[in-house]
Amino acid sequence: MDLTERHKRILKALVDEFIQENRPVGSKTLFDKHDIGLSPASIRTVLKDLEDYGYLASKHTSGGRIPTERGYRFYVDSLVILYELTLKEKQRIQQEYLKMQFKLDQILKATASVLSSLSNAAGIVIGPAKNLDTLKHLELIHVRGDEILMILVMRSGTVLHRNIFVDRNYSQEALYQVSKYLNDNLKGYDIYEIQNVVVPNLMVRRDGPEDFTRIAELLSSAMNPDNSEVTLYIDGFKNLYANFRDEEQQLSQVLSLLDDQGFLKEFFSEYIDQDGVYTIIGKDGNRSMSGVSIITSNYKMGEKKIGALGIIGPQRMDYNRALPLVDFTSKLVSEMVTRISK
């Protein structure tokens, strides 16, 4: 059933009140504190409708009502009025980054802290997947006999080392020529593009050094990144203890969620390719997250989407501030990551 404007007005007022006070909300509270323009009796009728439709649930001990996951979902999608961060708040966020050297790991660690402190939830950042990072420089070094060391310097500042065993002994001069050819042709591409597009095309062209085609496939396969190397940055456990202090089961659940790094990496990675800010509420997620909401957005290096960040907290989080916070932070991180990659 479509909600009327009266239903929407009262649902918004109730969710706003519950987020602010964290206790069930009754018709008297809505009448006294919100300019709804209805009598308490009319408000009670609308509240009963909203409960029947699945947007609210009763707390019989108090007589008040609380939002359900469906209620929160409608509130976030249709009712929330986004707060605009003030210049002072934006400058506070920017100041946190000016305290550090511009290195990727420091930026991402600081981002988790910023998100946590300004949202009163847990801040989380997923570092770039190695196969999405773009190549800045490659070097091949003869180690001994049939062993070559390949050094990959990525735009993010990550340095990867790979030992390759070949079918013959190559001189350092030959490896220098291959390295130069690869740098001229591979720079700026990510590992997926290098393996699946660029190197195959170079092998067809056959305009490289004499030794290139003999070792190209070995070099390409050796570039495979270990995606377990993806780093996870989390801050704000104290906020979660405070938010869920009266809800032991939900606290245990959210701590278990944060302890499952494999799940978190997989979960947030699903949003790297998605533009915009996403809100996942409770069972919207692909595992039990009752009472928990996640707000996430990606960040970019230039035009390339390389990672994700966000906040995890109670469903009663202040969405009108949390959503613009995540949005602004993702854009700021994208600017800084792009700057250090040049």
From Swiss-Prot:
Molecular function terms from GO: DNA binding
InterPro entries attached to this UniProt entry: GAF-like_dom_sf, HrcA, HrcA_C, WH-like_DNA-bd_sf, WH_DNA-bd_sf, WHTH_transcript_rep_HrcA_IDD
GO terms (BP aspect): negative regulation of DNA-templated transcription
Keyword terms of this UniProt record: Repressor, Stress response, Transcription, Transcription regulation
Pfam family, one: HrcA
Family indicated by similarity: Belongs to the HrcA family.
Free-text function comment from the UniProt entry: Negative regulator of class I heat shock genes (grpE-dnaK-dnaJ and groELS operons). Prevents heat-shock induction of these operons.
Name of this protein: Heat-inducible transcription repressor HrcA
Natural source organism: Leptospira borgpetersenii serovar Hardjo-bovis (strain JB197)
Recorded name of the encoding gene: hrcA
